């Protein structure tokens, strides 16, 4: 979406130390408003709760057998941090409508900071900051490693 001057409305969000659900809801609202959103440091996004319970919950969802007939009929679940976050945002968008699909297409999620975004100003949302958590939390990168992610950057 273009502003009156012709420049695109684009924002770069630093995901390190942010609560996943709260960050995903803010990002979903920005996407529906027409912003192009880039989220960097996806592996440092925080999930609140007991780490063992969070990993076990994701493990049963992602690695659970949904079809005993054939592995190719099983639902394909994300295992990388950037896809896990994008899947969370997707759940907060009207994905079956053209408006929601266009909004999801404007989202880019990265592990680390890519070269083309270095030097840009990163935005942080205080309502999604993990400093409000008292103790139990785990980073999305640690959950992804438990699910089989090798720690590489997706192209």
From Swiss-Prot:
GO biological process, one term: translation
One Pfam short name: Ribosomal_L13
Cellular component GO terms held in the UniProt record: cytosolic large ribosomal subunit
InterPro entries for the chain: Ribosomal_uL13, Ribosomal_uL13_bac-type, Ribosomal_uL13_CS, Ribosomal_uL13_euk/arc, Ribosomal_uL13_sf
Gene3D superfamilies: Ribosomal protein L13
Keyword Ribonucleoprotein assigned: yes
Organism superkingdom: Archaea
Keyword Ribosomal protein in annotation: yes
GO molecular function: mRNA binding; structural constituent of ribosome
Alphabetical keyword list: Ribonucleoprotein, Ribosomal protein
Quaternary structure annotation from Swiss-Prot or TrEMBL: Part of the 50S ribosomal subunit.
Family the UniProt entry places it in: Belongs to the universal ribosomal protein uL13 family.
NCBIfam families noted in UniProt: L13_A_E, PRK06394.1
Biological role: This protein is one of the early assembly proteins of the 50S ribosomal subunit, although it is not seen to bind rRNA by itself. It is important during the early stages of 50S assembly.
Annotated protein name in UniProt: Large ribosomal subunit protein uL13
Species in which this protein is naturally found: Aeropyrum pernix (strain ATCC 700893 / DSM 11879 / JCM 9820 / NBRC 100138 / K1)
């Amino acid at each position: 979406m273009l502003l009156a001057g012709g420049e695109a409305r684009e924002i770069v969000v630093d995901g390190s130390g942010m609560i996943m659900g709260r960050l995903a809801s803010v990002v979903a609202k920005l996407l529906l408003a027409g912003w192009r959103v880039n989220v960097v440091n996806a592996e440092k996004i925080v999930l609140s709760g007991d780490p063992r319970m969070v990993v076990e919950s994701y493990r049963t969802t992602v690695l659970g057998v949904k079809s005993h007939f054939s592995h190719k009929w099983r639902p394909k679940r994300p295992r990388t941090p950037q896809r896990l976050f994008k899947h969370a945002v997707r759940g907060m968008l009207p994905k079956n409508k053209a408006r929601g699909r266009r909004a999801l297409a404007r989202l880019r999620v990265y592990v680390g900071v890519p070269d083309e975004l270095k030097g840009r100003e990163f935005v942080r949302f205080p309502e999604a900051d993990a400093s409000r958590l008292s103790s139990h939390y785990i980073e999305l990168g640690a959950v992804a490693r438990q699910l089989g992610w090798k720690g590489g950057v997706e192209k």
